[in-house]
């Protein structure tokens, strides 16, 4: 008997919505990355994007442990000499809370074209409202 290999024609994608209120950043991001990769499905195939769509609401109400709010630093570079910019987690949550979850999940996905296609299925919103109601998302319970 041959092993089952998923193909793009055999994949059925669902939409899930996750409320980030009170959840720890890393634990929540890990669960989201599993769903985006499709590791929670029986048809998981490593070289095919078998994952589902995930909508995250209330990204500005995420929590972190310890002193990460002041000590965690995000780096970006403008490609010019001396163009390094540093932003703390506290500043990032004030300006762009969506990017905090997006960057955490991005680091947990494969690098390359497959990982980028998986990341495109993630939709993060700072507030409680999202504009994906037409997709009829199911609530994804995070159990910790």
Curated annotation (Swiss-Prot):
Protein's GO biological process: negative regulation of translation; translation
GO function terms (MF aspect): mRNA binding; structural constituent of ribosome
Presence of the UniProt keyword Transferase in the record: no
InterPro entries reported in the protein's UniProt record: Ribosomal_uL13, Ribosomal_uL13_bac-type, Ribosomal_uL13_CS, Ribosomal_uL13_sf
Sorted UniProt keywords: Ribonucleoprotein, Ribosomal protein
One family name in Pfam for this protein: Ribosomal_L13
GO cellular component: cytosolic large ribosomal subunit
Domain of life of the organism encoding this protein: Bacteria
Similarity comment text for this entry: Belongs to the universal ribosomal protein uL13 family.
HAMAP family: Ribosomal_uL13
Subunit record text: Part of the 50S ribosomal subunit.
Job of this protein: This protein is one of the early assembly proteins of the 50S ribosomal subunit, although it is not seen to bind rRNA by itself. It is important during the early stages of 50S assembly.
Protein name per the record: Large ribosomal subunit protein uL13
